[in-house]
Amino acid sequence: MSDDVDRIMAVMQSAFDPEYGEAWNRRQVEDALVLGNTHYLLAGEDGEAPASDAAAGDVAGFTLSRHGFGEEELLLFAVDPRFRRRGIGRRLLERFAAQARTRGARRLLLEMRRGNAAESLYLAHGFRPIGLRPNYYRTLSGPRIDAITFACGDED
């Protein structure tokens, strides 16, 4: 698992803008993965699982999610900027949804900051806004940004 955490951290470091403070640190990722209900997926350049011996720099994206009570929450979703606009995010989101459903998830959830470029991808995959948290995120430079919660599934 340590090698996979290295791969997750490499993508996260390149994909998340520090201005928004969305990236997790290594300890947060490791602590989440110790729990039996937290799952991750890695994506290579084709959006599929990379070879087990792939170097951290060869991983194009990842998801980290938590399952419980018939729901799966997408906690982190990232594609390295070098690999964006190639369908990797779309394929990774499809794989996430399929695997969540095999674990019994009837509803998929996520939260994002307003203005996140991935919003159109989420909408295209059936996610719908279900809530708004005004001024939820604070940027490093000070302004606050709303959080939007989305759901996809039988209860959205």
Predicted stretch roles:
Residues 88, 105, 127:
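Short phosphate-binding/catalytic loops that engage adenosine nucleotides
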Residues 100-111, 121:
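Conserved GNAT acetyl-CoA-binding A-motif
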Residues 109-111, 123, 128-146:
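Conserved catalytic-core motifs of GNAT/GCN5-like acyltransferases
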